[in-house]
């Protein structure tokens, strides 16, 4: 029987990512696997600022650290016994499949589909698409078009996101 022992889940604070996170917790529990929860602060977002804004960077870092802490608590409470978090800066399209997958020795990467529309996906491509194309391991992309209407995030709640907007 195929089992996964080292799972990476990419989260960004969206409903889609939290939906995928919940599924990653289930897969990690069923396989008694290590779960690494990753958030990438996309450094490309800084390019729109003419002057590097330290306050923006600190707010992004605080958001990511609290997000990862919340997800780690949820995974541990759900019964995942080996949970780690990683915060990185750069392009998620490169860091997740090309750097972290090998560096952490993961055998499964899980992620949600992006919130991009068809035009945005055509122009910039999606993170999940880049992961599928470049990852050296299995990838499970959680389809998020059918998130139940009553789905309520436990970590990336509207109140949580509002603190950092």
Swiss-Prot record:
Main localization (coarse): cytoplasm
Keywords noted in UniProt: Cytoplasm
Subcellular location: Cytoplasm
InterPro entries hit by this protein: Rossmann-like_a/b/a_fold, Universal_stress_UspA, UspA
Key word Cell membrane present: no
One GO cellular component term: cytoplasm
Pfam family, one: Usp
Family statement: Belongs to the universal stress protein A family.
Protein name: Putative universal stress protein SH1215
Organism: Staphylococcus haemolyticus (strain JCSC1435)
